[in-house]
Amino acid sequence: MAVERTLSIIKPDAVAKNVIGEIYTRFEKAGLKIVAARMMHLSREQAEGFYAVHKERPFFKDLVDFMISGPVIVQALEGENAVALHRDIMGATNPKDAAPGTIRADFAESIDENAVHGSDSLENAGKEIAFFFKPEEICARTR
């Protein structure tokens, strides 16, 4: 098993529901450590840049509009197989398909407002973490 890092975003709908602490508890109980975190209100430019891979998809404008509709919490998580573990904790993209007890099953309303984002691969995790955090902003968790 490899120690990995992944990017996680608590989206505006979950921030508005005031479930940040509950989501963090799930990360930590699963063995993921928060090594960087920040609350921010994404600009349109930031949201478009982050989700540029989806630029030609029909949902792109709605996704960007949603992501700038309120503050988000962006964090880098670290742990054994962090990418896959985080995706398991989040649940399926569509909360209707998400397993009971996952973040999306418990806190998301729809596929459009689905509470959280997580990197889909180790390669993308590195790119996504670098989008939001400078290397010196990531704290080693050795204790």
UniProtKB/Swiss-Prot annotation:
Places the protein is found: Cytoplasm
Show the GO cellular component annotation of the record. Answer: cytoplasm
Quote the Pfam families the UniProt record gives.
NDK (PF00334)
Single GO MF annotation:
ATP binding
Where in the sequence is the active site?
A: H117
Q: Which InterPro entries match?
A: NDK-like_dom, NDK-like_dom_sf, Nucleoside_diP_kinase, Nucleoside_diP_kinase_AS
Q: What is its main location?
A: cytoplasm
User: Which cofactor is essential here?
Assistant: Mg(2+)
Entry EC number(s): 2.7.4.6
Q: Which reaction does it catalyse?
A: a 2'-deoxyribonucleoside 5'-diphosphate + ATP = a 2'-deoxyribonucleoside 5'-triphosphate + ADP; a ribonucleoside 5'-diphosphate + ATP = a ribonucleoside 5'-triphosphate + ADP
Matching entries from NCBIfam families are given as: PRK00668.1
Question: What does the record note on quaternary structure?
Answer: Homotetramer.
- Name-wise, this protein is Nucleoside diphosphate kinase
